[in-house]
């Protein structure tokens, strides 16, 4: 599948899309970089300017049939305190109003061998509120598999889903899991908060089942994440 990135794409969306090239999908930076022809494409949208001209992006696709992928994050809401989550909500609404096939995925914090959050937690950072915040982190490999199944037609291109693990864990428990796992990366690699802490503090418990059912995913169990971090 050819995936066209519309405007700036921030992480984790950019990283997930880049990893999908290993599964045979082609990433294109902007409609102008598309090869000639009428091959179907996916128009990928994520973090960008507050004002995004969806119609203009669609028009630049020319004769290519397209579907739209909205790469969002948990917590996107018009009343969110974090400006980034408000912006994502506006993008979701803007895209939904375009009357084109749209699949919206709201990603939970991603955990895996190379995720910035996992590396950050390994550095034993201080945690807000004693690390009591409950999260539904999801294995990055499950997020990649979700996108792969959407691109190759194994899941219907419709609706919105919370891509989140079924197990609730506190931020402190997640840090403990990360620090106990074997690690072969650079000792000075402290990663980063992904998403930002201010976003995670707004997370409510997610609904994992609709996502898992729609995409035929068996979420990676919490206890397997330590193994995934060294795979």
Question: What do these predicted ranges mean?
Answer:
Residues 26, 30-32, 80, 132-133, ...:
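Generic anion/oxyanion-binding catalytic loop in active/binding sites
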């Amino acid at each position: 599948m050819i995936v066209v990135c519309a405007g700036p794409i921030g992480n984790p969306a950019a990283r997930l899309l880049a990893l999908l090239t290993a599964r045979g999908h082609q990433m294109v930076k902007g409609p102008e970089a598309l090869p000639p022809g009428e091959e179907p494409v996916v128009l990928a949208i994520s973090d960008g300017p507050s004002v995004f001209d969806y119609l203009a992006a669609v028009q630049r696709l020319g004769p290519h049939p397209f579907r739209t992928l909205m790469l969002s994050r948990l917590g996107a809401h018009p009343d969110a305190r974090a400006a980034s989550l408000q912006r994502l909500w506006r993008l979701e609404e803007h895209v939904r109003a375009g009357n084109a096939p749209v699949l919206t995925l709201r990603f939970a914090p991603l955990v895996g061998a190379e995720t910035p959050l996992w590396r950050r937690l390994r550095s034993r950072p201080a945690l807000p509120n004693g690390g009591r915040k409950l999260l539904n982190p999801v294995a990055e490999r499950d997020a990649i598999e979700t996108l792969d199944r959407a691109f190759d037609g194994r899941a219907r291109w419709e609706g919105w889903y919370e891509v989140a693990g079924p197990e609730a864990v506190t931020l402190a428990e997640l840090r403990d899991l990360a620090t106990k796992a074997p690690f072969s990366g650079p000792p000075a690699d402290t990663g980063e908060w992904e998403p930002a802490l201010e976003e995670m503090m707004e997370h409510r418990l997610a609904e994992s089942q609709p996502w898992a059912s729609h995409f035929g995913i068996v979420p990676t169990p919490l206890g397997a994440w330590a193994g995934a971090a060294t795979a």
